[in-house]
A protein has these predicted regions:
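Internal intein/HINT superfamily modules and their associated LAGLIDADG
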Residues: 1-199
Length: 199
């Protein structure tokens, strides 16, 4: 849903058929990205990774990655086009693509903007904050109506299905139960509807 507003597809015919090019769209300076970073935190908690390694007995943040199936490459393009940082790399032997940032200043920028929004990949965020000299901020696990974080989780780890027997549309999220996921409270994300939780 985010990608459609921010990319433009052009088709061009050549001797072998048609090809499509996704063009980057620029945004006005001073654009407010707070809602975007909430959504991005959900995407990172879903399919992101803070690559923190031990180098010479010290923890080092090597990269921040988001790995998605190729069918979702527009999500990665949207992130790259909005932030104007990172690169998207495709795996030739597998149907996956990765958005990756590894420059220290880019990782510093991203961590500063998602600090206080990450709820599931907390250990990696804490180590990243420590490496970059940023004070870790704990996120609020109670979500308000239509929180973009929820959309980010659904975009990566969710599914929307039609339940024929119940005659309703369902949005499903599946988590590994741990100390962080057990604190998630989605009771107010969809007004007038409390989600069912099963273990």
């Amino acid at each position: 849903c985010f990608a459609a507003e921010n990319t433009d597809i052009q088709s061009a015919e050549n001797c072998k058929g048609f090809s499509e090019t996704t063009r980057q769209i620029s945004y006005p300076k001073g654009r407010d990205l707070r809602e975007f970073f909430k959504w991005l935190a959900g995407v990172i908690d879903g399919d992101g990774n803070f690559d923190v390694r031990s180098v010479n007995s010290q923890l080092v943040l090597k990269a921040i990655r988001i790995k998605l199936h190729d069918r979702d490459i527009r999500i990665l393009s949207y992130i790259q086009n909005t932030l104007h940082i990172g690169r998207v790399r495709s795996d030739k032997n597998k149907p996956h693509s990765i958005w990756i940032i590894s420059k220290k200043e880019e990782m510093f920028y991203l961590i500063n903007n998602i600090n206080g929004l990450i709820r599931l990949k907390v250990p990696g965020l804490k180590k990243s904050c420590n490496y970059l000299g940023i004070d870790y901020k704990e996120a609020n696990y109670n979500f308000g109506p239509y929180d973009p974080y929820f959309a980010g989780l659904v975009d990566t780890d969710g599914s929307i299905v039609f339940n024929y027997s119940g005659n309703r549309i369902e949005c499903n999220l599946e988590f590994e139960r741990n100390e962080f996921s057990s604190k998630l409270n989605f009771d107010n994300v969809i007004p007038n509807y409390k989600p069912a939780v099963s273990f």
